[in-house]
Amino acid sequence: MLFVAACGNGGGSLFNDSIDDYISNNYSLYDTISSTENSDEYARVYLAEDRDISAVSSELQDHEEPTEMSELREGKQVFIYDNQFVTLTESEDNSSDTMIEVAEEEFVRNNYSPGFFQGYLLASVLGNMFGNNWGSQRNQACAANPERCYGGYNSAGTYVGKNSIPTIRGASTVRGGGTGSGK
């Protein structure tokens, strides 16, 4: 397992946006993923066009050091900020783009497959956050109901929380149209 502990200030000054605000202000919202457990929980997926994972990783770390951070491996890197998980993956549509998934801790606890983090974060980090039995309990839940176990945005599978009609993507790329056009 590869693991790097980030040493930093754990958050910026009073004048810095939270990492969630920084991401939403600097990248395009691409899609949302609904929780299978609680309709108030969801993950947001952003698109960093023409920026590879290393560039986006540097931008995020320059804004705020994560409390935990994996190494970049096989087109994926995971950060933990306070109560949020940020996952960077290479876009399946364009290898020069990066997908940025932001999920609250509770969304991760209740929806993610433990295997999603295998090789990226130590089990002890997740155990400290979610309880020592989280991995085995989620594995059992995933075995019983695989469609209720989320494997990340670019994963194949039948997770029921994935929006069959994406909330953002699929919209026209043509902007404008004047008053009353609905854009």
Outline where the language-model segments fall:
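C-terminal motif of bacterial Sec signal peptides marking the signal peptidase cleavage site
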Residues: 3-6
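Low-complexity, glycine/proline/serine-enriched intrinsically disordered segments
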Residues: 8-183
